[in-house]
C-alpha cells in the first residue's frame, strides 16, 4: 500500500529498468483522500520516467473499487486497472481480476462509524472520493461475458488476482473462525470468493488458454506450487517475483 516504498524497491533497490510491475491488490486506495495518491504520483514520476518503468494496480480488499475504473487513477507511469483488464508485455498476455473478502470487515465498519463524523467534517467532497476503511463491493466477480469476449481475441498465459483458486494456499486465513463468531455470513462469503477464482480457472481451461503462471496476494505470506501445469505463486507484502 506504500507507493513510495514500491517505487524505491523497483527503481533503487532492484535497479530495474524498462519494467512493468503489476501489484496483486491491497494498494491502499481509499484510506486517504484522492489528493494523497496524486501527490505520490508527482513525487515519484521523475524516478519512474528515468527508469522507464510502469506500475499497474489490481484491486484488493484494502482498496476502494472506485479507483479501479481505468480513468480515476490513470497516469503515464501508474494506473489502477478495472477487473478483466488484459495486459500484453514481454510476450505475455496477462489477465487481471481483483477483489477479495475482508475477514475483519465488521471491525473495520465499526471503526469507521466511530471515526467518520470527525473525518468528513474536514473534507471537501467536490471532485474527491470520500475516505473509508471498508467497501461493500470488495468481493471478486465472475463475469462470463467478459471472459467470452476476451477469449475471442486473446490467449492468456498469466493470471494476476488478489485471492486464489480453492486448491491454493492458504486454505484458511488466520483467525478466520474467530472473526466469523461475530459475522454470520463470513465463512460463506469467503468460500464464494474462492469459488469465483475456480470458475475463472475453469473458463480458462475449457477454452484452452495456455496458462502457466498465476500470481496472487491477500494472504500476506509467501508460497508457490506447480499444480496441473500452472505455477501458482502467493506473494507476501512487497514481495517481487
Where are these regions (language model features)?
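Active-site-proximal loop/helix segment associated with metal-binding centers of metalloenzymes
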Residues: 92-195
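Short glycine-/acidic-enriched loop or helix-start segments at secondary-structure transitions
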Residues: 6, 32-33, 66-69, 106, ...
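Short, solvent-exposed loop/turn segments at secondary-structure junctions
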Residues: 27-30, 62-64, 99-103, 163-168, ...
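Core catalytic region of metal-dependent phosphoesterases/phosphodiesterases
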Residues: 3-90, 178-180, 186, 190-196, ...
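Adenosine-cofactor binding site in Rossmann-like domains, unifying the SAM/SAH pocket
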Residues: 2, 85, 99, 138, ...
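Beta-strand-turn-beta hairpins that frame and shape the catalytic cleft
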Residues: 86-96, 158, 226-232
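Conserved beta-sheet core of the metallophosphoesterase superfamily
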Residues: 54-58, 73, 167-241
Amino acid at each position: 500500500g506504500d507507493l513510495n516504498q514500491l517505487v524505491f524497491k523497483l527503481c533503487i533497490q532492484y535497479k530495474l529498468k524498462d519494467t512493468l510491475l503489476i501489484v496483486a491488490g491491497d494498494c491502499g486506495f481509499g484510506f486517504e483522500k484522492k489528493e494523497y495518491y496524486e501527490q505520490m504520483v508527482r513525487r515519484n514520476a521523475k524516478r519512474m520516467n528515468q527508469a522507464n518503468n510502469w506500475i499497474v494496480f489490481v484491486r484488493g480488499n484494502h482498496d476502494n473499487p472506485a479507483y479501479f475504473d481505468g480513468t480515476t487513477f490513470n497516469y503515464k507511469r501508474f494506473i489502477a486497472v478495472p477487473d478483466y483488464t488484459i495486459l500484453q508485455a514481454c510476450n505475455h498476455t496477462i489477465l487481471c481480476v481483483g477483489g477479495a473478502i475482508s475477514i475483519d470487515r465488521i471491525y473495520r465498519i465499526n471503526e469507521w462509524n466511530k471515526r467518520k463524523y470527525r473525518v468528513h467534517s474536514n473534507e471537501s467532497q467536490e471532485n474527491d472520493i470520500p475516505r473509508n476503511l471498508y467497501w461493500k463491493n470488495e468481493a471478486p466477480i465472475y463475469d462470463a461475458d467478459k471472459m467470452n469476449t476476451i477469449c475471442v481475441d486473446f490467449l492468456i498465459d498469466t493470471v494476476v488476482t488478489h485471492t486464489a483458486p480453492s486448491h491454493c494456499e492458504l486454505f484458511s486465513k488466520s483467525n478466520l473462525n474467530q472473526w466469523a463468531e461475530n459475522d454470520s455470513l463470513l465463512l460463506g462469503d469467503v468460500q464464494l470468493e474462492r469459488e469465483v477464482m475456480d470458475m475463472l480457472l475453469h473458463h480458462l481451461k475449457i477454452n484452452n488458454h495456455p496458462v502457466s503462471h498465476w500470481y496472487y496476494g491477500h494472504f500476506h505470506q509467501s508460497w508457490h506450487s506447480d499444480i496441473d501445469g500452472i505455477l501458482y505463486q502467493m506473494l507476501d507484502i512487497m514481495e517481487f517475483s
